[in-house]
Amino acid sequence: MGTDIGDLLLKDTIEIAGLSNKVVAIDAYNTLYQFLSIIRQRDGTPLKDSRGQITSHLSGILYRLTSLIEAGVKPIFVFDGKPPDFKSDTLAKRHEVRESATAKWEDAKAQGLEEEAYKYAQASSKVTREMIDDSVRLLELMGIPYVKAPSEGEAQASYMVQKGDADYIGSQDYDSFLFGAPQVVRNLTITGKRKLPKKNIYVDVKPEVLSLVDSLGELGITRQQLIDIAMCVGTDYNTGLENIGPKRALKLVKEHGDIKVVLKELGKDIEDLDAKRDFFMNPPVTDDYELKWIKPDRAGVIDLLCKKHDFSEERVNKALDRLEANIGGSQSTLDQWF
């Protein structure tokens, strides 16, 4: 997912405390996908309730957002709306990848290959409509605001940061910069120790902050040229040019000025180029949202998680105690959130 331009961008590692009192517009689909990929058993099986319904995403929302809020972060979830028509090929390819990964996961499990199984299980992750509906409901009950974008969630989140309604976008993808996000924070919901693939080595994963202005200045390019570089490499809307990585794309765009000249020189073509470039520069966004963090509905959360999805009531209550202590306790605590 996204575009592979990360090696070109400046990154600063920070502690989570550095985001205290900051509003972060979180790319909901991207984050739910992360929860579904990471919150799994050793053989890759996701968390499920007694009816077989996957609950990894709900666990991530409750426990990881509670930890963020304890650290002073003010999260907003931004959900995707209708994707542009020219994203259909990418969505179809993702479906094929998931189907293939699911088959390989089942095969690896049958052979007792836990590490292989886990890898393929992660690649098989899928965010369904029911998962989104349950996620929205849980956010409402937890008192955390969410926004429904008219189209791409990253575009809406970028707009909210541009307006000053949020300080950062929270996403693992770099597409946010193509939509004009001033600042992005990565690894927000996956901070902690992570095992390296095929190695018995664990590394500390910390949040990374990236600035669009700083990266463009370092590269000596404009945002439009960054979009052109991404399109050379490949985006959610087009396949990249053969044998063109981010560094070569940067060189070509700086040398020729824009992607149209690059394509002419290479004898290549990108379908609907103008429409796709314009979509990055001028995506559909909305001002129809309200940002309020309110006291959680304890009974509602317990009903959704414990009665419907078999969560431990003791653990859920402990998480709610922590949540209420930070956004639902005294008036002075609440005042810090507005």
Swiss-Prot record:
Keywords per UniProt: DNA damage, DNA repair, DNA replication, Endonuclease, Exonuclease, Hydrolase, Magnesium, Metal-binding, Nuclease
Binding residue positions for Mg(2+) 2: 173, 175, 236
Stretches for region Interaction with PCNA: 330-338
N-domain: region residues: 1-98
UniProt remark on cofactor binding: Binds 2 magnesium ions per subunit. They probably participate in the reaction catalyzed by the enzyme. May bind an additional third magnesium ion after substrate binding.
Residues the record lists as binding Mg(2+) 1: 27, 80, 152, 154
SUPFAM superfamilies tied to this protein: 5' to 3' exonuclease, C-terminal subdomain, PIN domain-like
Ranges annotated as spanning the membrane: none
Cofactor names: Mg(2+)
EC number, UniProt record: 3.1.-.-
Positions of the UniProt region annotated as I-domain: 116-257
Family that this chain belongs to: Belongs to the XPG/RAD2 endonuclease family. FEN1 subfamily.
Self-association state and partner proteins as the record states: Interacts with PCNA. PCNA stimulates the nuclease activity without altering cleavage specificity.
Role played: Structure-specific nuclease with 5'-flap endonuclease and 5'-3' exonuclease activities involved in DNA replication and repair. During DNA replication, cleaves the 5'-overhanging flap structure that is generated by displacement synthesis when DNA polymerase encounters the 5'-end of a downstream Okazaki fragment. Binds the unpaired 3'-DNA end and kinks the DNA to facilitate 5' cleavage specificity. Cleaves one nucleotide into the double-stranded DNA from the junction in flap DNA, leaving a nick for ligation. Also involved in the base excision repair (BER) pathway.
Protein name: Flap endonuclease 1
Organism for this UniProt entry: Methanococcoides burtonii (strain DSM 6242 / NBRC 107633 / OCM 468 / ACE-M)
High-level lineage: Archaea, Methanobacteriati, Methanobacteriota, Stenosarchaea group, Methanomicrobia
Gene this chain is encoded by: fen
